[in-house]
Amino acid sequence: IRFVSSENKKPLLPLRDIVIFPSVVVPLFVGRKKSISALEEVMKTDKSIVLVTQKNSEVDDPQDKDIYSFGCLSKILQLLKLPDGTVKVLVEGLSRAKIKAVSHENKKYLSCDIEKIDSEKETEENKVYALSLIKKFEKLSSLNRKDSIDLVKTLKSLKDPGQIADNIASNLNISINDKQFLLELSNLTKRLEKVYEILEKEAS
């Protein structure tokens, strides 16, 4: 493990059975002491934290080898302490983040050194692709998902093709591994194509 530089150092929160995407708002229930400590720390500062998925959800105290090397730099929008000692947080994904090093210096929680993966500039071709994604998703939703009506409205209000792809990816009925693959797919055109391909399979 390399030395973690302080300017890129962020608290790290490993997640079980969920992948967080940029521009998506998700509620999380957190119970592990280290995770709660990390959340308490970020609430004192800029409320930004790196959310990363565990490779095996059954590991209770995940180490470097137990988490993926790609996560999502996120912002805590709301934190609520529940009577049973757990915490409910509302998080918003901000950007893809490559985890370059994990630090165990602080015994209370993990932190990491990240490289932010900026979203690509949109092209006319990608905009057209994103619109066809929305149409495909809307058609699929009308067949089997009552709760997707609000999501379709949200998708139609978005202008950025990357945000459209990520919002759909977050709601796809696919494995955690497949969602992680989409998170790591930083090339926007390839990501739009892959999400469309998955929707095609779901529709067939």
PLM region spans:
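N-terminal low-complexity, acidic/polar interaction/targeting segments
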Residues: 1-204
